[in-house]
């Protein structure tokens, strides 16, 4: 959530900055009207409180003199009733302002390129050279069928479209990938591993920005005979980041770096007809998430570090990729700056997103009231939060199957994964 004081004092300027966000126009008139109502009711509340306090003192003095105070008491009671009414009106207006503020995206950083969609993203660099095959390249679906490791028909039978069953050595590689990523991030990059719930409450989803705006992208669950509604996590970013909700952290304990391997669940609303073949876009997929909680002045530096750590996974797997700086029209709702890492997919002859690394600035921290305080300082300040995929396990599996395929349909196991697969070098029929 944007700083309400900043929004209040610089409404036109912020509205102009947010125009570059795809599909968003800040309703300046509505916000201005609500602000005027807030100011009027705030002044009225303070005036009534002052008058009531003054009248109460008058009652005390009159009572001490033995005077009749019944009329004064009636006036104070009337003021109290009026004050309660005004307070209720003020609370309603403040709720409206907050609900409006919760739908406003983050302000892009100055260095973020202007643009409408992904065609305006800026390529930063490419790493590795796509392999040239001397045989006809198969996609991961065909390779999975040859090896008996990807069963999309079973996924449809069990659950429906955009689900799959992964079996045998392909399932083993899928597990090996997650273990390799976790070991890299915990042993070399300084992250602490976390195991978190896959079901979260609405307060948690508000904290990281999925609600109220993106409820249709979630799977919601309401157990029988239970009033509590949950949602399946769309990413481990949600529970991991919320671990600092309502906390005041000693600045000496920052940065906090956490990683988690979880399944992720997304309804893929609005993506009908896109990537209907294979593992690229699923309702359920695994991901290793990276989260950092940092001091405000260090968040841009932390974004570079976090992105480099996600890149290291691709480099160790020797998978060609490119790094892209997202434009204003393609960034996520809560991000101020985002890098995407796109891995080479031979059968599609293109790069596809495998990681998105974002600096959320104080956007999530304000929603969560996650703060830090320096030693000896009474004042607190909001932390900055960052997150990124390190990496999406299913898409990494896709990239390995296609980039490491052989003419007979077998798959060469990347060297760094072999210790996790009992030394297996080739996955064959």
UniProtKB/Swiss-Prot annotation:
This is Serine--tRNA ligase. L-serine binds at residues 235-237, 289, 389. Its EC number is 6.1.1.11. Consists of two distinct domains, a catalytic core and a N-terminal extension that is involved in tRNA binding. It comes from Histophilus somni (strain 129Pt) (Haemophilus somnus). The lineage of its organism: Bacteria, Pseudomonadati, Pseudomonadota, Gammaproteobacteria, Pasteurellales. GO terms for cellular component: cytoplasm. InterPro entries: aa-tRNA-synt_IIb (IPR002314), aa-tRNA-synth_II (IPR006195), aa-tRNA-synth_II/BPL/LPL (IPR045864), Ser-tRNA-ligase_type_1 (IPR002317), Ser-tRNA-synth_1_N (IPR015866), SerRS_1_N_sf (IPR042103), SerRS_core (IPR033729), tRNA-bd_arm (IPR010978). The keyword Cytoplasm applies. It catalyses: tRNA(Ser) + L-serine + ATP = L-seryl-tRNA(Ser) + AMP + diphosphate + H(+); tRNA(Sec) + L-serine + ATP = L-seryl-tRNA(Sec) + AMP + diphosphate + H(+). ATP binds at residues 266-268, 353-356.
